Amino acid sequence: MTLWRSLQIAGLVAGMAGAASATEVKGVLMDKACSGKAEVRVLSTGIEGGMIVAEAHTRECALMPACQKSGYGIFTYDNKFLAFDTAGSRKALEAIKASKKLDDLEVVVTGEIKGDTIKVESLKLL
């Protein structure tokens, strides 16, 4: 094998290793405006928020103009909110409008996570 061919193969392998890979995330679809209600808070009276609040979030609320305008994201089973990119929010809105579910909008999202945002490749309501 020539030196040039070896360098090409090494470059290809290095490029593939540096490529971002898609991650599958499961949770509940919510709008950003309401996501703060689901954040877990420890109070003197007990714990508030969390997945119970996220699952109770309604389709009707998610379709309100202010909630649509805020964009969407996923509240994960480890109690974190990942905001969708603009294209992901459009996909989420289409899925919510097409769904007959009234609440508990469980979803599987595949995409690239960067910080607290996910660039959505695919989204499926369960």
Language-model regions, residue ranges each:
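Bacterial N-terminal signal peptides that target proteins for export
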Residues: 1-10, 18
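Short N-terminal leader segment in a subset of presequences, especially plant chloroplast
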Residues: 9-12, 30
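C-terminal segment of classical bacterial N-terminal signal peptides
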Residues: 15-21
